[in-house]
Amino acid sequence: MKKIILAPAVVLLCAASAMAQDSEPKFTIKPTGRILMDGAVYLGGNDDIEGTSDKKFVDGVAIPDLRLGVKAGYGKWKAKVDVGFGYGKVGLKDTYIEYDINESNLIRGGYFVPQFGLNSETSSSMKPSYEEPTSNEFFYANPRLLALMHIYDKGQFFAGTTVFAEADAMKKNATEMGKQAWGVQTRLVWRPMHSDGDAFQIGCSFNYSSPTGGDHNAFNYSSNFPSRVSKVNLLTANIDHARGLFKMTPELLFMRGNMALEAQYYYMNVARKDGFRNYRAQGAYGMFRALLIGSRYRYSHADCGMATPDPRSLEVVLGYNYTNASDASAGIYGGITNDASCTFNYYINKYMIARLRYSYTNVRDRRIDDLTVKRHVNFIEARLQIIF
């Protein structure tokens, strides 16, 4: 009788043990990496720079971005560590821990790019226009920061809220810095349509930051011509006697079938003290995207933007950017730039993309040290990138 009773009991215990093991979260680990191989030819752009501190455009090739890293997951926990080796310089990239509270909420802490504007949904190597718009770079819209971020992502609404310390907090300790700048920002999006081949969303992002430059009483903003083979300064604004900064960027995304339109406007106001006038700057960009080969664009719900097109798709991207970094009332003339570009992207497979880009970029009203007041350049770039 005891054997008859014990036998089913043992079977039940074994089954319960097996079920417990099956429900136990599995630890996963995955290597990651990327390599970008660029080549560029510059047509003109070097006139009237003799005797100035302007750099020359030089035709050439480069590997501007090379990274190796690892992703790990365990149940609702995720982690990532990414190290960059671009131009032979070693630097820490994304390094964070993430916890999924539920299907609609997550918290991320560490060193990463927080949500701010439409461009925050793609990494630097996945910009459809080859490089990020100049306005996005100049307004320091998507830097990597030591931050804590909460994401709400459900149905028609997306909200990302972040508190952060300045980027130098990853390079220096607090005593060495003397003081740490801080800030808070949010990205708010409404997307009444958000399915593959049919999406429309509008949103706005807001940021407040304390000064990071000098002895934490200034802001230093700059951007290069949109090329990483030759790095040549385009805009520069050094704003001293700063008390704090407010910036915002409304965004628009429309996608229908194999065509899409995206745009952002940027506005920045730096409050100043000691009787100095506030500094104001603004900019905007727009991109028209179309699949020449491929069925339709897809929507990425988690990123709140467009997903990478399917393998063997060919895409054309027409882009225009305007940035005004000169403010006469503040006595700061960082420059005014226009950029028009045409980019072809061929998505070879899941891991490889080939890009070809033509761009015309000019700058005027630039009164920075002994740089030329105005300058322009035409250039053609090609890139092969591998990302896994």
PLM feature spans:
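Outer-membrane pore/translocation modules
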Residues: G39-S53, S120-T122, M126-Y130, Q201, ...
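Outer-membrane beta-barrel pore domains
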Residues: N220-F388
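Flexible, solvent-exposed coil segments and beta strand-coil junctions
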Residues: D47, G73-K78, S125-E131, T162-D168, ...
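Outer membrane beta-barrel
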Residues: E24-L43, K56-A169, E176-T212, A290-L292, ...
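Extracellular loop and loop/strand-boundary signature of outer-membrane beta-barrel proteins
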Residues: G51-K56, D82-V83, E132-N136, A167-T175, ...
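Sec-dependent N-terminal signal peptides
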Residues: I4-C14
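Sec/Tat signal peptide C-region and signal peptidase I cleavage site
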Residues: A16-A20
